[in-house]
Amino acid sequence: MLIGRENEMATLHGLLTSDESQFVAVYGRRRVGKTFLIREAYKSYFIFQHTGTYGATRRQQLANFRESLYLAGMGKSAMPKTWSEAFGLLWNFLKTFPESEEKKVIFIDELPWMDTPKSNFVRSLDHFWNAWASMRKDLILVICGSATSWIIDNVVMNYGGLHNRLTCKVFLQPFTLRECKQYCEAKNLGYMDRQVLEAYMALGGIPYYWSFLKKGKSVAQNFDRIFFQPGGELVQEFDALYASLFKKPRCHIAIITALAKKKQGLIREELLKTSRLTDNADFSKALQELEQCGFIRKFTAIGKKTKDATFQLIDNYTLFYFDFISENTNGDEHFWSSSAGSAIHYSWAGRAFERVCMQHVNQIKEALGFSAVISSVHSWSYKGTKDPSTGKTLTKGAQIDMLIDRNDDTINLLTSSLKNIHFVIG
C-alpha cells in the first residue's frame, strides 16, 4: 500500500528509460519510508540488494556484504579484506549480466552504517562508480540511509571523486496531514479529521509510527499501548532514533533537551548556556546535522539578522517524548488517557498545533491563494517590560505565531488556535 509519493515514484520510474547508468541517493529522516519507496519503484529490477548493519565492525560489514552477494547468486568467494576488494567482487558479479536496454538495479540500504572508521569505504564506492559502473549504460545504483547528514556530507556535497556524480537526489519528506488521512482511510481506522490531527501532532508524518495504530482502537488507546505499556512498539524509540542517526549523539541530545525546555526556541548563545555545551566545531556540526535531519529549524524573526537566528525543536515525536513519555515517571500504562483534559495536555496541544501549521506552510499559502508568490516565513514576539523597582508590568508581551513575508509587498499575519474550531483536512 503506497500512499502519496507520486512525484518521487515518477522520478524513480523515469530513470528506467534513461540512456545512461544512474547514481541515485534517497535520503530522509529515519522511518520515513525510504526503503519501502525504493522497493515499490524497482521491485522487478533488482539484481543486488544489501543493507548495512548498525554498529558492526568493518570485518562484520564486509562479511555481510559477501553474504548478500552469495544470496544474489554470485556463489562462494573469498572473504574480502577491504572495501576495494568487496566492490571488485560486486563488479565481477555484475559482469555476469550482459549489457542490455533494460535497467538493472543495485540497492545498498543504510549505507552510512557501512562507513566504519579508517575503512576507506567512500573512496572505494567512488572507484566502483567512476571506474566501473558508470561505464555501462544499464545500471541504476541506489544508495539510501537515515543518517541524512552523512549522505549530504559524503555523497551529495562530496568534493572528491563523487563530486557531481549523483544523477538523481530524492529527499523523502514526512507525510502531510492529507496523506496521513489517506493512510487512515486505507487502513479503515475510522478516525475523524480531528483525531487524525491529534495523532499527527505526536507522530508527525512518519509512516512507520502510523503503522502501529490498530483498527478498533481510539487514538488514546493506541497511544497508551505503543508509548506507555510494556512491550509497546515505540517505548524505546527515542534512544534508538538518535543513536542510529549520529555516531556520537551526546551533543545532539543535549541540544534537543535544551530546546525542549524552550518551545519558542533559543538563539545560539542561549542554547549554549542552557545545554552547557562548549562553543566549538562539534557544537556547530551537531546543530547543522539536526537541521539537515529535520529535527530542528533555524529561522530569524522579521527584521533580524542571520546571526540572531533562533533554533527551534520541531520534530513532533521528540517533543511528544519530552512532554509525556519522559514525564511518565510512575510507569502509568494509561498515561496518555489519564492526561486528557489536563493542563499539560492543553498546553502541549496548543504548541503542537502551531508546529503542524508551520509544517504545512505550502498548503496554507495555497489555501490563501498566493502559492506562486515567493515568500519567507518568520515569527514575532515582544517580551513586554516591567518596572525594575516594583516588578509591575508596564507593557504586556505579545506574539504572532507566523508571519509570511511576500515578494508582492504584503505580509500575512497568522495565529493558530485549536479552541472552538471545526477542523477539516482538505
Predicted feature descriptions by range:
Residues M1-S338:
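Phosphate-binding site recognition
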Residues I302, A309-G426:
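A cross-kingdom feature that marks ATP-driven nucleic-acid transaction machinery
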